[in-house]
Swiss-Prot record:
Organism of derivation: Shewanella woodyi (strain ATCC 51908 / MS32)
Function: Forms part of the ribosomal stalk which helps the ribosome interact with GTP-bound translation factors. Is thus essential for accurate translation.
Molecular functions (GO terms): mRNA binding; structural constituent of ribosome
Protein name in the entry: Large ribosomal subunit protein bL12
Gene: rplL
Pfam families tied to this protein: Ribosomal_L12 (PF00542), Ribosomal_L12_N (PF16320)
Binding partners and assembly: Homodimer. Part of the ribosomal stalk of the 50S ribosomal subunit. Forms a multimeric L10(L12)X complex, where L10 forms an elongated spine to which 2 to 4 L12 dimers bind in a sequential fashion. Binds GTP-bound translation factors.
Amino acid sequence: MSITKDQILEAFAEMSVMEVVELIEAMEEKFGVSAAAAVVAGGAEGGAAAAEQTEFDVMMTSFGANKVAVIKALRGATGLGLKEAKAMAESAPVAVKEGLEKAEAEALKAELEAAGAEVEIK
């Protein structure tokens, strides 16, 4: 008499976690295999996509046509003085803020783009 897959699954369902761990270890030893997840070799971006980014940098690539509005937006977002904000705008491409959460980075990007700047999030 052979045991069906359903019977095996039912037996697993009735086991405690420790019993399942012991069973897996015994199966690894018996069959010479490992229950570790297989690592799939992908492209260079495959690993980066798997680990989701949690910190973002807002980079201004250009201040666009409306430099005054961009300087005002930079002052409001960073707390810089007029001279420092003007220097930042003129030194584009420049990191406006670094290590932001995604929502904060998106909001800052929208604010600077509304003022006329060209902005990227990295």
